[in-house]
A protein has these predicted regions:
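Mg2+-dependent prenyl diphosphate-binding active-site environment of isoprenoid biosynthetic enzymes
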Residues: 22-267, 271, 275-285
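N-terminal amphipathic/basic leader segments beginning at the initiator methionine
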Residues: 1-20
Length: 289
């Protein structure tokens, strides 16, 4: 299956999950959730869930609820990341951000509800109960104190500081990398894959996440609003140190290339059919948006 075919299936599944009764569908909260969740995007995280499930010997269709769950979780993080108390951004995917359209209170609640729905979607799936539990545990770990929320906290309290590369990596491995690691490992868990598969999937996700963040930092300085669909230069305006600040453009390009090559090598330690994931890693390393 191609990346575009995966995206079409994921978008259709997300829309199906949010076919709500009329009494709920017209509420401001439901409209706020749908506004961000169904706004498009690359769908990288759910794609990773489905593909890792496939190459670990599972049925990707059975893992679709898990894939949708991680996209709900990711969408919640974007809504909250854009809030005035965080990055205070007004544009996301070429559209006004959630709080600009629906207000800060509704946007906050939309994110909260999407997080709850993510776990409910996993636990209501048709996967064997032990696989549901494993996926939920992986996702919870990726979001909590040692994961995405902990990374966002460090990002806020260290704002304006001169960060070392190690400190910057600590922020980004939690804030960005943890959810990508979770996507890969949840796919394996949904398939009932081995510990070796889980380990290799985690190493792939960590390298992919770091490369993704470095490329993001590059685009924040090199791209345009029209191309990215979100503000550029916001890191500099908020006095946040980035990989571009620490490594420069050449250093960033070199590091992204090294991480991408590592991510592809590590897959071969536990999986055979890795062509799609290798192509995805290559594509993300040179993405323009």
């Amino acid at each position: 299956m191609t990346a575009e075919e995966y995206r079409v299936k994921i978008d259709a599944a997300l829309a199906e999950y949010f076919k709500l009764p009329d009494t709920l569908a017209q509420s401001g909260l439901a409209r706020s959730m749908r506004y961000s969740l169904l706004a498009g995007g690359k769908r990288i995280r759910p794609m990773l869930v489905l593909e890792f499930c496939r190459i670990a010997g599972g049925d990707p269709d059975m893992a679709m609820p898990v894939a949708c769950a991680i996209e709900m979780l990711h969408t919640y993080s974007l809504i909250h990341d854009d809030l005035p108390c965080m990055d205070n951004d007004e544009l996301r995917r070429g559209k006004p951000t959630n709080h600009v359209v629906f207000g800060e209170c509704t946007a906050t609640l939309a994110g909260d509800t999407l997080q709850a729905e993510a776990f409910g979607t996993i636990l209501r799936s048709a996967l064997p109960v032990e696989r549901r539990a494993a996926c939920a545990e992986i996702l919870a770990g990726a979001v909590g104190l040692d994961g995405m929320c902990g990374g966002q906290y460090l990002d806020t309290i260290w704002e304006g500081r001169d960060l070392t590369e190690q400190e910057l990596s600590e922020i980004n491995s939690r804030k960005t990398g943890a959810l990508l690691v979770a996507a890969c490992q949840m796919g394996v868990a949904a398939a009932g894959g081995s510990e070796k598969m889980l380990d290799c999937a985690g190493h792939f996700g960590a390298a992919l996440g770091m490369a993704f963040q470095i490329r993001d930092d590059m685009l924040d300085e090199m791209s345009t609003v029209e191309m990215l669909g979100k503000p550029i230069g916001s890191d500099k305006q908020q006095d946040k140190h980035t990989y571009m600040h620490l490594l420069g453009r050449d250093g960033c390009e070199k590091t992204v290339a090294e991480l991408t090559q590592f991510s592809k090598r590590v897959l071969c330690e536990a999986f055979e059919d890795t062509a799609f994931l290798c192509e995805l890693a290559d594509a993300l390393s040179v993405r323009e948006k």
